[in-house]
């Protein structure tokens, strides 16, 4: 659970049992045989994002939203480039960010959106093959890394408090046409070769 939901081991035990079992059943993770074959979108998520954008009537693009307010007949979205009125608005953002954007949140919105909590995560894209099994036959699309260690000065890429990390083998998942092995490691709990680190991002 700590690896699947990127949370510290002490919090993983607090996840409701029914939710865990339901998740495992839905993703066929309890099957020992005839497991489903997972597919990925060729070109990555950017491809279907572009497809949606090509069909959408976009008023503002890459524009910061200041706040959203409601009137009797419509919803007003105020941005750094002006404001626009809409019949309704769908928030595709974290619950706490959505709550901050609402200029006049209702009691129900305050109650529901205020209950969400998030875990900070670090994603590192790199080509350090030392994280993988020595035998190439044991390489898989993703690997779980379990260690009890904490971040130290000698391990700058480690995420403090997280004992579970895992790596995606991007060549396998995205069919990359290159000889360099590329990995995306979430919450690395081991030292990575700094010379082989390409990109580092932080998410919630």
Which residue ranges define each predicted feature?
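Mid-domain catalytic core of redox enzymes
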Residues: 66-204
């Amino acid at each position: 659970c700590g690896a699947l939901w990127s949370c510290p081991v002490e919090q993983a035990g607090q996840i409701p049992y029914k939710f865990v079992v339901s998740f495992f059943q839905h993703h066929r993770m309890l099957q020992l045989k005839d497991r489903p074959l997972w597919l990925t979108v060729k070109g990555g998520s950017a491809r279907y994002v572009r497809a949606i954008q090509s069909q959408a009537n976009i008023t503002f693009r890459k524009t910061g939203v200041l706040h959203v307010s409601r009137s009797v007949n419509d919803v007003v979205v105020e941005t750094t480039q002006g404001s626009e009125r809409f019949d309704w608005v769908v928030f595709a953002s974290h619950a706490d960010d959505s709550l901050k954007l609402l200029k006049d949140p209702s009691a129900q919105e305050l109650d529901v959106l205020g209950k969400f909590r998030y875990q900070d995560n670090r994603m590192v894209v790199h080509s350090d093959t030392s994280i993988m099994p020595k035998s190439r036959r044991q390489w898989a699309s993703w690997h779980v890394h379990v260690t009890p260690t904490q971040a130290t000065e000698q391990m700058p890429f480690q995420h403090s408090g997280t004992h579970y990390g895992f790596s995606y083998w991007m060549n396998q998942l995205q069919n990359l046409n290159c000889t360099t092995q590329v990995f995306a490691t979430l919450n690395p709990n081991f030292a990575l070769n700094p010379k082989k680190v390409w990109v580092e991002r932080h998410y919630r």
